[in-house]
Amino acid sequence: VYSALKRLLVGRPIATSELEHQRLRKLVALPTFSSDALSSTAYATEEILFVVAAGTSSLALGLSRLVPISIVVAILLTIVVLSYRQTIYAYPHGGSSYVVSRENLGSKASLVAGASILVDYVLTVAVSISAGVAAIVSLPAFRGWADQRVTIGLCLIGLITLANLRGMKESGTLFAFPTYLYIVTVAGMVLYGLYQIYFGDDVGRIPFDAEQAEIQREAGGSLGLFLLLRGFSSGAVALTGVEAIADGVPAFRKPQSRNAAITMMAMAGILGSLFFGVSVLAHHIHPVPSHDETVISQIGRTVFGEGPIYVILQLATVAILTLAANTAYADFPRLSSIIARDGFLPRYLGNRGDRLVFSNGIIILAVAASLLIIAFGGITTALIPLYAVGVFTSFTLSQTGMVVHHRRVREPGWKLGLAISALGATATFIVLLIVAITKFTVGAWVPLVVVPTIIALFSAIKRHYTRVAQALEIKPEEVRPQPFNHTVVVLVGRIHRGVIQALGYARSLRPQHLVALYISHEDDDREEIQRQWREFGINVDLEIVHSKYRELTTPVIEYLEELDQRWNNDTITVVVPEFVVGKWYEQLLHNQSALLLKGRLLFRAGTVVTSVPYHVEGYGIVPSVQPKASAAVSPNGAGDTGAKPPKDADPPDRAADTPPAAR
């Protein structure tokens, strides 16, 4: 049932040899890796206005500062993109901030970069989905759904998670159309709106109360500068996601670096044009930032009216904001796999799933983003202050690493590259300080606490793997024959076919000592098992331990301790007879004592636990291992009694309800 459902939802497994065919051409890679950056045009202008035009009394001031702030953000975008373009060529196998920092700045810097960018990817999903839900509830037909933001957001995360579990190529193709639709509709809105403003009939303005605008202007001073810097730090979210292409170079078709560089420059041109165009329109149209309707919705409604083009704009906005999370879904699992291979994350994060994607990383990302959506109620503005700290930390470290790279490698034109990287590192570090200071009290403190915590977790995981490797390390001279004392203990309940097979298996191990152990709860149990043992003529020592609390695991462990003292064992093998019923739901009718016992014994040193399954199909019995002709076993492996179970022996399912042979 599980396998069939998995194939239906995720698709057929893909062979490793097909990995090359899963790589992306530029037209598909652009929406796959750029949807995060491009989608920020749907809320970056709004976030600037939310801060600088805090309330209607300062809207005029905010609008007067909007275009200059947007110009500065566009210049910063140009610097960062030019710097990352060099990273693409320098690191064709993936130039994430983590890799660049590790190669040039050392392990500690790479851990800071890795933790920061992982947090950023989680926030990318949470912010994009929250903004997408805001676009949905901005439509007049759906404004009554505003109180269902969290539920809608979780459903969207579920859908995009499922799409990514199906594989990079399928998800990229799926996401291409909505991304290009958004680009066309927003570009059309900007061009048509600007044409109407400068060459046609003025599109008009959204009314607002500007009575106290001069009061805000006159306030000036440090408060005015603080608001200006805070607004700039909010607008800087437009840069989130621009590094994704540099991270995902291995996903491009060959020549990978060239195709990735072309895609990044195209993304930067589109992003800068749309962001600046929306800001200019906002400057003329005077939208009022509100949680009830987004700024881009107000602009679109003013330019297009409430007709079908406006609806298409909103649907395209919802689509790209939802799909913007795909950038994080593409890069979070890949970065996690790199960090895992370095030993700082669990190694299973480095394994590809059936569809050649890092399934474990995808699932972890989905869970983390869902928790953020729930914690912050799906409100985009509440999540934004958390967003920029990780982004600009990774930007700064990556570009600082490229400065060191240029000085070390000194490739042709390295001085120009060094200058660009140094300028980028300086600019992004200044932005990081602005974000941390101006937004500390409204949420920027969270990543400043979470990132060091993740770094501590990285270090703890690395120490664990190092200790395990040291404990397992062995030298050639240590490998030599030595005495080995082996005892096998077979856990038995009532005698049935599974027990007989388990005894035969135990004999085949040829141990120095072989015993059968029965845990009794009542005196009648003791007498019954002794009677059966004599009746079947089993030539294996039977030892009976009474459990006064009717428990299985503790008496078994205490008995094993006694055997270690008695025979000075190197290893004890505990053989657990189990039967497997034909239908999965039939398993619910039987206790799970053997499973619990195996879990406890796993942590006992010098103990091996072996299950001997016996498959029951209907009223017939199909053994998983053909038993010996004789059921009788001697402790030293010699001599059989030839005894066989009688026809009136207990049926397997009745016998299995008596521990420890139950399953």
Predicted ranges, named:
Residues 30, 348-359, 395-432, 437-440, ...:
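C-terminal membrane-solvent junction of multi-pass transporters and transport-like membrane proteins
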Residues 107, 147-154, 251-273, 340-374, ...:
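Loop-to-transmembrane helix boundary motifs in multi-pass membrane proteins
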Residues 49-102, 106-116, 127-156, 268-272:
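Extracellular loop-to-transmembrane helix junctions
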Residues 183-212, 278-285, 398-411, 459-469:
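Hydrophobic alpha-helical segments and their helix-loop junctions in multi-pass secondary transporters
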Residues 180, 185-240, 438, 442, ...:
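Helix-loop-helix junctions that connect adjacent transmembrane segments
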Residues 160-199, 263-267, 384-396, 416-427, ...:
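Membrane-interface loop-to-helix entry segments
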Residues 266-269, 273-323, 349-374:
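TM-loop-TM module centered on a large, flexible mid-protein loop between adjacent transmembrane helices
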Residues 1-17, 467-663:
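Cytosolic C-terminal regulatory domains/tails of membrane transporters and channels
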